[in-house]
Amino acid sequence: MPSRTEREKMLAGEAYNCLDADLELERQKVKRLLRLYNLAEAAAERQTILRQMLGRVGRESIIEPPFYCVYGQHIHLGDHVYLNVLCTILDCNQVRTGHHATIGP
C-alpha cells in the first residue's frame, strides 16, 4: 500500500507532520494572498484574490478584511455568505458554509 502524503493524512483527520515541506509551501502561498487581500481597497480586487485563494466562493459572498486562514483552498463558501471583520478560519480540513450564512460579530 503506497504511503499517503501529509496533506492526505491531514484531510483524513489523522496525525500528520505539520512541518511537511509541501504543506509549508501551501501556507506561504496563502500568506502572500492574504496580505494582498487585506490591503486591497477595491471590492472587485478582493473578490479576484478570494477566488484564487479559496476552494469556492459563492455568488455575492463577502469577507470583510482583515481575514485569516491557514490553507484557503479547503474553504468553500455558499452563495450570499457574509464573514465579518477579523474572521480566522483554521482550515486544516474542509470548511463549508451553506447559502445565506453570516459569521462574525
Predicted feature locations:
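Terminal amphipathic alpha-helical/low-complexity segments used for targeting or macromolecular assembly
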Residues: 1-60
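A structural motif detector for beta-strand N-caps
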Residues: 60-69, 75, 79-89, 95, ...
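Short amphipathic alpha-helical patches
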Residues: 33-34, 53-54, 73-77, 81
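Solvent-exposed, flexible loop/coil residues
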Residues: 14-15, 19-20, 71-73, 93
